[in-house]
Amino acid sequence: RSQRAGLQGSEILSDPVRVGARAEIVLCAGAIGSVQIMERSGLGQVERLSGMGIRPRHRLAGVGENLQDHLQLRLIYKVSGVKTLNAQAKHWWGRAAMGLEYLLFRTGPLTMSPSQMGVFTRSSASVDRADLEYHIQPLSLERFGEPLHDFPAFTASVCHLRPSSRGSVHINHPSSLAQPQIDPCYLATDYDRQVAASAIRVTRGIVNQAPLAAYRPQEYLPGPQYESEEALVEAAGKVGTTIFHPVGTLKMGPASDPSAVVDAQLRCHGVRGLRVADASVMPTITS
């Protein structure tokens, strides 16, 4: 049975206002945001919504499921005999000099993208096409939001392009001010753990090549003490973080697929006048 879609929104910190639609509503809030709007509107898993006091309006078991993301493993190497952005950008005077150079000459670090090099390669000879991607940055930090290191270093960020792990996104409170519950389930499958371990080995092999020998690279993170398969998987969990590519939580597929939320025209199954047009509809993550 098809339901007619209606939109209920609210101004920030004010009473809700109801907005109708003469034709269609198109959700474009992303793989995290669109799920929250759907669930708070009563579209999703009936038991989950009922448990939070939300009146279920249409059962869609796939809402919030099938979350996929690229997990980047941030391997950091100390180097010698060369300057990196750690020295240039760590202190205010260095940042001021960078800004002045850009203003006067339109040159210098502020003209660069965050990553100066990208590489595609295979995690092993058994795969028929590249399944790893590198982003190389001439800087390093312990984790996002923290200061740059006080030693020269570069970061080799490597991610598995086609992970098999699947997570979920769901609301945990009816209020639109509440944060969602995001469970990415990184490295949840044997295959993903195997590729992660291989990615660290491949990175070490690249760094140990002759062209980099003059800079005497030393592995800082995760550290050379991680050697066995089990240890490398543990290391991947320590240095891994999102690369901000969440997709799949409102999966596209035929109505015969119980996990599908929208059809090939992005129309929500069973709900007239509602489409979703963002990365949440992607059945699988792209590389």
Question: Can you describe what each PLM-predicted range is?
Answer:
Residues 2-14:
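N-terminal low-complexity segments that are often proline-rich with Ser/Thr-Pro
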Residues 29-30, 41:
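Glycine-rich, N-terminal phosphate-binding loop of Rossmann-like dinucleotide-binding domains
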Residues 23, 35, 45-150, 207-210, ...:
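Mid-to-C-terminal "cap/lid" subdomains and adjacent gly/pro-rich loops that border
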Residues 118-126, 132, 137-142, 151-216:
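C-terminal segments that line or cap access tunnels to active or ligand-binding sites in enzymes
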